[in-house]
């Protein structure tokens, strides 16, 4: 290793993982080598997201969001957003980096203006149950919010109007995602079901309309995450059943099951599959699980290509960005 070691932000591939051991780790995706570890004091990390310009990473934890600089080796957060009373479960960014959105167990989704020197949130959307997940529609104008009561809220940021749907009453919505083409929305819940809708509208003044497409009994245990691939042809679902399943969006049939179940009869569960992210070419997927590992898999064959070992406790979230800015 030479003395002019590059920073995480200079690497064309950013892979970061975090969870219950109060650290965020950065990895060389191809080699499995941990290149940097930053401490995240006082709290587990629930969600990670890289800013659109790849200069910083946001870590959402208990009562705060911390921003770490990817273009230096500074081990401390460069910005702290506080003033939230409970766990922050979800974080993401507007595509041009103007603002950040979060959701949390205080039943609020928030918008934070990243250009403001005032580190207070600018807008709040209140619901009646703790929020597990928030995702920004590709039109950058609607926030999709999933809560523990089983409701999915569509918050129109232009008009401040909102609509809601409840695919399964009193079953917590744990993850929502929209594919890059804005053709489909998926949501997974604690009974292991995955719901898919066709999307129409969402342009100009029109609020997005959701037309039920299918319900997949994806897992027999709690489903924790759903993600569409960048090319919109695949949907991944992660679960407490120790699997991540890959579904074809052409007919929502199962293509591949990625399992961390042990073949040893005496070995108990290796834990939950918490999070996943596809590579930019949709050929690979990284998973985070509570056996302290992240793994890189080949989507087509289900083969493990790399393991990322170093966390001392469960890995519950990751950020994977292999897009090269033009």
Swiss-Prot record:
GO BP annotations, alphabetical order: regulation of actin cytoskeleton organization; TOR signaling; TORC2 signaling
Tagged with keyword Membrane: yes
CDD domains, per the entry: WD40
Localization: Lysosome membrane; Cytoplasm
Chief localisation class: membrane
UniProt cross-references to Gene3D superfamilies, sorted A to Z: YVTN repeat-like/Quinoprotein amine dehydrogenase
Keyword Membrane applies: yes
Keywords: Cytoplasm, Lysosome, Membrane, Repeat, WD repeat
Signal peptide boundaries: none
SUPFAM superfamilies from the UniProt entry: Quinoprotein alcohol dehydrogenase-like (SSF50998)
A single GO cellular-component term on record: cytoplasm
InterPro entries with a match to the protein in the record: MLST8 (IPR037588), Quinoprotein_ADH-like_sf (IPR011047), WD40/YVTN_repeat-like_dom_sf (IPR015943), WD40_repeat_CS (IPR019775), WD40_rpt (IPR001680)
WD repeat coordinates: 1-37, 40-80, 83-122, 126-165, 168-207, 218-257, 268-309
Assembly, per entry: Part of the mechanistic target of rapamycin complex 1 (mTORC1) which contains MTOR, MLST8 and RPTOR. Component of the mechanistic target of rapamycin complex 2 (mTORC2), consisting in two heterotretramers composed of MTOR, MLST8, RICTOR and MAPKAP1/SIN1.
Family: Belongs to the WD repeat LST8 family.
Function of the protein: Subunit of both mTORC1 and mTORC2, which regulates cell growth and survival in response to nutrient and hormonal signals. mTORC1 is activated in response to growth factors or amino acids. In response to nutrients, mTORC1 is recruited to the lysosome membrane and promotes protein, lipid and nucleotide synthesis by phosphorylating several substrates, such as ribosomal protein S6 kinase (RPS6KB1 and RPS6KB2) and EIF4EBP1 (4E-BP1).
Name of the molecule in the record: Target of rapamycin complex subunit lst8
Organism the protein comes from: Xenopus laevis
Organism phylogeny: Eukaryota, Metazoa, Chordata, Craniata, Vertebrata
Gene expressing this chain: mlst8
